[in-house]
């Protein structure tokens, strides 16, 4: 289901929350959405912004006001946007962002303010965040288990990892160690790269030299293609696994 078709259901569900009687009786529902429409993750944020055209103008007779801001994938900018939603827009609901690091930042603000937050990217829902934050994408442990089971079925014993040098990369690497390693696989080598990087040649050479049975790429959006194309150019012939965060029209 498209995440923004789901957002209408999210708003409707929010109206039923006991903690939000004021919002249910309001003259309008204000939704602040911070997404990444510029920078390396724009391939994720632009479709999210465009999908807002399909958000209904009202639910249950209550008008909906949607305010959209760009954070460029920067946690600091996402924090600023979220605080604007709280202090200036008086938002009833906050959504965003498009990638994990700024989503964590938005969650922090939403939880401080006591405003429902719906993340559009996977992020760790710690006990202190669970009261106000929900991650809309499929949880990484669920998606990861399917990948690791496929690896096991294909006799993969050693796995090389290359992922973002941020919280999204950490989530996937830690999940592989938690679920994949107990299935009988070992980490051959771990490499990282930054989202804006235009080359991962050095990391690819190390991965090729390690010659693992498979390589897991913990990246999202257009930049997730960079390690895969580089690995093939450097002669890697093994299996390459992408995550569900890599899915985009540009990829």
Give each language-model segment a name.
Residues 228-251:
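Extracellular/periplasmic periplasmic-binding protein-like sensory domains
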């Amino acid at each position: 289901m498209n995440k923004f078709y789901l957002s209408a259901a999210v708003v409707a569900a929010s109206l039923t929350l006991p903690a939000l009687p004021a919002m249910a009786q309001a003259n309008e529902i204000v939704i602040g959405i911070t997404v990444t429409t510029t920078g390396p993750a724009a391939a994720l944020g632009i479709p999210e912004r465009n999908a807002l055209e399909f958000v209904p103008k009202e639910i249950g007779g209550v008008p909906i006001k949607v305010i959209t801001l760009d954070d460029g994938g920067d946690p600091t900018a996402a924090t600023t946007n979220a605080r604007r939603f709280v202090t200036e827009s008086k938002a009833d609901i906050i959504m965003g962002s498009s990638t994990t690091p700024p989503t964590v930042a938005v969650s922090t603000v939403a939880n401080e303010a006591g405003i429902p937050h719906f993340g559009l990217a996977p992020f760790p829902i710690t006990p202190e965040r669970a009261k106000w934050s929900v991650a809309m994408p499929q949880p990484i442990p669920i998606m990861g288990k399917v990948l690791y089971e496929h690896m096991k079925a294909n006799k993969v014993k050693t796995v090389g990892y290359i992922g973002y040098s941020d919280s999204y990369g950490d989530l996937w690497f830690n999940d592989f160690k938690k679920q994949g390693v107990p299935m009988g696989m070992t980490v051959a080598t771990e490499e990282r790269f930054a989202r804006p990087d235009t080359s991962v040649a050095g990391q690819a050479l190390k991965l090729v030299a390690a010659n693992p049975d498979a390589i897991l790429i913990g990246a999202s959006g257009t930049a997730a293609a960079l390690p895969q194309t580089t690995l093939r150019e450097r002669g890697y012939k093994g299996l390459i696994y992408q995550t569900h965060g890599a899915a985009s029209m540009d990829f």
